[in-house]
Design a protein with these regions (language model features):
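Acyl-donor binding region in acyl/amide transferases
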Residues: 188-191, 197-277
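Short, high-confidence coil segments that cap the C-terminus of an alpha-helix
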Residues: 46-48, 180-181, 240-243
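Flexible loop/turn segments at secondary-structure boundaries
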Residues: 2-7, 34-36, 58-62, 81, ...
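Conserved Lys-Pro-Asp/Glu-containing loop-to-beta segment of HAD-superfamily phosphomonoesterases
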Residues: 37-58, 64
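A conserved beta-strand-loop-helix scaffold within acyl/acetyltransferase catalytic domains
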Residues: 3, 138-220
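Short acidic-hydrophobic, aromatic-tinged amphipathic segments that line or gate anion-handling sites
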Residues: 25-29, 73-76, 138-141
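Terminal substrate-recognition subdomain of acyl/acetyltransferases
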Residues: 43, 65, 69-135, 236-301
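Substrate-recognition/cap helix-loop segment adjacent to the acidic, metal-dependent catalytic center
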Residues: 1-28
């Protein structure tokens, strides 16, 4: 299988609608589909549950379906007249009623991630690699201008999502207009490009007690310790508002296991635990700023 032959088909075949500029990554080799899908997930830093596999081979479809149950798998029908039915069934996976600027920039964002992945291989130390990125995070409070993206993050993020509560744009507007709530949105960039709006925290304030309703970051920025800088920022804001205690909850979903001990790692006290959840509280005067990584610059917008 020749890489150039594939490129020629993409660019020259009269029936090929998708051109190279729309394709973030190609795997042209003799490896099995399961291995290549795993590599794509790693290279683009996206979850397997964000990938849809489409193939006309019953063998390949069954192999991927059995080995990667997180994926949505679609078999291309052998009869042309059934194509419309298949497209109708998967339409919701590809189209939103509204789109954000970041939706239109997804291919660029993924190509920038490929550059990072290639550079990462040249470093033997993860801290040196992350420091080389020149990471900047910008945090906005109660921003009306990106409510569409804030809602998208809430609806789509599974892995680093402590409670996995889903909120529509109407819900987010409601939080912003309610003086009891603070909605913090996080955006990240580095020397290779802009990751876009990739984090969300919703805080309920009641007297001297604040409760984290939602805390989540997109999988595309996982592994950079950004979550610690984000929680540091929120805690500082709560201190500025004379909040004495910050309460939080972890709700287990099966997809967010990696976040199970996040609040404990941040110094929260575990108050109550069950098979499906953990409840925490933090006395803010006792909190020591994580400062996990000093290479992350935090900008207050």
């Amino acid at each position: 299988m020749d890489f150039q032959d594939v490129n020629n088909v993409i660019e020259s075949h009269p029936d090929m609608i998708l051109k190279d500029k729309y394709i973030a990554i190609k795997k042209v080799n003799w490896l099995d589909k399961v291995t290549n899908i795993r590599k794509i997930s790693k290279d683009l830093n996206i979850g397997l549950d964000s990938i849809i596999f489409i193939d006309d081979s019953p063998f390949e479809v069954n192999l991927v379906r059995s080995q990667l149950p997180e994926l949505k798998v679609v078999k291309v029908p052998s009869k042309l007249h059934k194509y419309t039915e298949i497209m109708r069934n998967i339409l919701g996976d590809f189209y939103n009623l509204t789109s954000s600027n970041e939706d239109e920039s997804k291919t660029r964002i993924y190509k920038e991630q490929l550059k990072r992945h290639k550079i990462k291989k040249t470093f033997s130390n993860i801290d040196e690699y992350l420091s080389s990125l020149c990471l900047e995070i910008s945090i906005s409070e109660n921003s009306n201008s990106i409510v569409d993206r804030i809602s998208q993050i809430s609806l789509k993020t599974n892995q680093f999502n402590l409670t996995t509560r889903r909120y529509t744009e109407t819900d987010i507007f409601g939080f912003i207009e309610d003086t009891r709530y603070c909605v913090y949105s996080l955006s990240v960039c580095d020397k290779y490009g802009d990751y876009g709006s990739t984090g969300l925290a919703i805080i309920l304030i009641n007297g001297g007690i604040a409760t984290i309703d939602s805390f989540l970051i997109s999988c595309r920025i996982i592994g950079r310790y950004i979550e610690f800088s984000f929680i540091d920022y929120i805690i500082n804001k709560m201190r500025d508002n004379n909040i004495e205690f910050l309460n939080a909850k972890y709700i287990k979903t099966g997809k967010n296991n990696q976040t199970e001990n996040f609040y404990e790692d941040c110094g929260f006290d575990l108050i109550e635990t069950s098979k499906t959840s953990k409840i925490y509280s933090l006395k803010l005067e006792k909190y020591t700023i994580n400062g996990k990584k000093d290479y992350i610059e935090v900008i207050d917008e």
